[in-house]
Amino acid sequence: YKFINAGNQHLIIETKKVFSYDLDNLSSKVRRRKFFKNVNISLFTKLPKKLELRTNEAGAGETLSCGSASAATASFNIIDKSSIKIISAGGELSLRKINDKLEMIGPAEFICEGIWLKN
């Protein structure tokens, strides 16, 4: 596993089958520890030329995609390559290393709308 600060904190765990784990249950157990209370937790699987990624964001639960988790995961998997694809439930992102920065390219879609209720 890796612990990375990408503007927010991420615990990134490599697994053989990213979709075979109960991510909500795992995240709940990890966050019981004081140090990991507000950490985003991601699982990833390495595939040829791409990574599969699932993320449980602190305070939100599992999300379709997470840009900071994608960047955090790519940051230590892109070392010998100039770019990598990340596949999540929300779609595909391409991340490219340019000098010491990461460029993220992918679609954005409107998926829902809500109303803020005041007490």
Predicted feature descriptions by range:
Residues 1-64, 72-119:
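Active-site proximal loop and beta-alpha junction motif in alpha/beta enzyme cores
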